Swiss-Prot record:
Organism this protein belongs to: Debaryomyces hansenii (strain ATCC 36239 / CBS 767 / BCRC 21394 / JCM 1990 / NBRC 0083 / IGC 2968)
GO biological process, one term: iron-sulfur cluster assembly
Localization per record: Cytoplasm
Keywords: 4Fe-4S, ATP-binding, Cytoplasm, Iron, Iron-sulfur, Metal-binding, Nucleotide-binding
Record: residues binding ATP: 25-32
Species classification: Eukaryota, Fungi, Dikarya, Ascomycota, Saccharomycotina
Name recorded for this polypeptide: Cytosolic Fe-S cluster assembly factor CFD1
A GO CC term attached to the entry: cytosolic [4Fe-4S] assembly scaffold complex
Function: Component of the cytosolic iron-sulfur (Fe/S) protein assembly (CIA) machinery. Required for maturation of extramitochondrial Fe-S proteins. The NBP35-CFD1 heterotetramer forms a Fe-S scaffold complex, mediating the de novo assembly of an Fe-S cluster and its transfer to target apoproteins. Required for biogenesis and export of both ribosomal subunits, which may reflect a role in assembly of the Fe/S clusters in RLI1, a protein which performs rRNA processing and ribosome export.
Requisite cofactors: [4Fe-4S] cluster
Xref: InterPro entries: Mrp/NBP35_ATP-bd, NUBP2/Cfd1_eukaryotes, P-loop_NTPase, YlxH/NBP35
HAMAP family, A to Z: Mrp_NBP35, NUBP2
Amino acid sequence: MDTSEPQESPKSLSNVKHIILILSGKGGVGKSSVTTQTALTLVNKGFNTGVLDIDLTGPSLPRMFGVETKQVHQSSAGWVPVSVYNNGQEKNEENKRGNLSLMSLGFLIGNRNSSVVWRGPKKTAMIRQFLKDVVWSGGENNVPLDYLLIDTPPGTSDEHIAIAEELRWANPDGAIIVTTPQQVATADVRKEINFCKKVNFDVLGVVENMSGFICPHCSECTNIFSSGGGKELSEKLDLQFLGNIPIDPSFVEMVEMQDNDQNDGKKKLVDLYDDCELKGIMEGIVDKVLEQQHPARF
């Protein structure tokens, strides 16, 4: 695998209009959940969306989208991502969803219980290959991908340097920073924001995840942890605060229901998400990102 520093944008991204990274200062803040729901929201808004899961230590997105048994295919042009949702119909007012595809190391390691015990050079080489060799398109007709979300490892490491080097010429829109309300999480987020400044990634905004708990019985939201840490950090650093996302047990149930026998119609997460309490919250967060109107890459 090639480990040399690139001098141009990866050709695999030439079919992608917008690139957004999802970053977190530390693990366990629900970054992959935010990535999943951001993708679902974009699809429901009619955008053809791709998700690149390069969190090599915990590639959980195949499980989140209910496609962990699917296989990645190799074409003459490169790896073909797994189709999570294919609208397959002409868009209209009643049917405006986009398509959704996913590429993840989880498809390549076979056993979901296997751990990835790799040294830094092998990790960075795999990340470079993911960014250069995946053939992104918005469906079977090779239409452009409107948005590519890149779910990154937590913290700042060699993997992040490799990501920054590969995307140096790709002109990404920027990064969404995910934190939880606690001070220990927001302190690490400062490091992530400093990293973005050093590698010239715009910070699109901060999301405070796990901000409260939605009762599954009465739907009332209770602050079981501290709250407001993400908003306070945003104000101090003059960044846009995108919103609070509470813990919603129903979303976890929807993820698990995809493989459940009770799911008679075998609904995908895209369909199940219509009934999620978090849907409206995520629409507000995504709208704030879209309102920034970053120009398309082509």
